[in-house]
Amino acid sequence: MSKYKRYAIVVILVSNGILISFLESFIPIPIPVPGVKLGLGNIITMIGIAFLGVRDVLFIVAIRCFVVAVLTRGVMMLAFSLTGGILSALVMALLYKKFSSMFSVKGISIAGALVHSTAQVIVASFILGQFVIMYYLPVLLVSAVITGFITGSIGEIAINEIRRKDIFGNSPQEHTDIDFGNILHSDKSDTLIKKHQILPKMDSGVKLFFAFILSIIPFLCENQISFIIISAYLIFITIFSGMKVRTVLTSFTAYFIIVVFPFLFGFLISLLFYQISGNAMFTYYQQISDTAIRMFQLFLLWYIGCIYFNTTPMKSFIGLFDKILTPFKRFGVPVEDHLKVIMCVIKVLTQIGPEVKRSFTESMSSMSDNKKWWSRINIKGISGIIVNFIVNSFKRMDAIEKYVKEVNAADLYNYRLKVSRLDIVASVSFVIVVFLVIIIENGYLM
């Protein structure tokens, strides 16, 4: 298999995984638990394990986690999704390659879901510095068995259908009517950024430097006034940038579900066990105020990332990322090719994403006319929708392979430092805020 054909397959599978996840909003989870999703995107991981090498599977997982984190403006989520995704992929690959006679695809999917949930809880516990989050793990493990079985059932049907049609074989693929040459000229990768926003006009590198420093400062602060100043500054930036209220609320909600709720659940369980048993093992020793400060510090980090990616053009950010990764090029790492793959995924999503979502909506609506929740967990029907979508998506493989091979990286992403008057004004305001925090932390105003 040529390098560019492999890249084309990665582009198709990653974009498929992200688009398939849209179906989750139509499928109720039998046991609704905050932070738990069906994980339909993991079907793509299982397909990769069945037909590709482990290295390609890890590449697919890494690209999918990165693209989702950037597009959903939740870059802090990368630590959770990447850790869980990589570990679960390795476990599923091991079971499929070495123990397929002992485990079915459903069983392998359940194992992957268990590992994914465990890894994410451990990461959350480590980041927050709170062991009580581990009390939330049993709830997630029970949910993982259910969601893993559903995902594995669909994945098994998809794998069998792909194997039957020999999609990954050497037989020529049907062509699609989508002209990927036009994608290069129709740049829709930054459609989520309003044209009237001011922050996108700032230099991406200057803005990244400010975001990085501003993310570190809260972890060095001890005075409450410093947190008030930083919060006020971020509120001003939010208003000034013209961010949607929905985006802000989504950021708050996501942080609560992923970080705050597991802690509160674990804390209450710990308190309950202590009241029942009186065992000191369940005592919560840390001050609530210290925990609240830690959560607030992490939220500021979370929200700063949200602001940055919500106001930064994708082409500019990927171009800046290319500059940052320049040292790796000297060691033979194909940075340019990998970034081209990322941009191609984004372009495929923006080009066909709306139409795919409409198609999914119509298909799922026709399956749930009686409005009963269990009628929407129609594994066979959902499998048919997903399999047809995946099979049809490979009709674009030849076009995508040619596009990835011939397109110039400079046409996909670029970055050049350009300091404007807006950058200077932003720098002055940033320096003032940092100066105020420094003098407050040193007690000069107290």
Predicted features and spans:
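Hydrophobic transmembrane alpha-helices
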Residues: 1-48, 180-212, 216-221, 225
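Short helix-perturbing small/polar motifs within transmembrane alpha-helices
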Residues: 8-15, 19, 60, 81-115, ...
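Interfacial aromatic-anchored transmembrane helix boundaries in multi-pass membrane proteins
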Residues: 21-38, 61-92, 105, 132
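Generic transmembrane alpha-helix motif of multi-pass integral membrane proteins
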Residues: 40-56, 91-96, 214-218, 233-238
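Transmembrane helix interruption/hinge and helix-loop junction motifs
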Residues: 52-55, 73-76, 101, 130, ...
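Membrane-embedded alpha-helical hairpins and interfacial helices in multi-pass inner-membrane proteins
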Residues: 74, 78-79, 101-172
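Transmembrane alpha-helix interface motif
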Residues: 171-226, 230-239, 354-446
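Juxtamembrane/interface alpha-helical elements of multi-pass membrane proteins
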Residues: 251-368
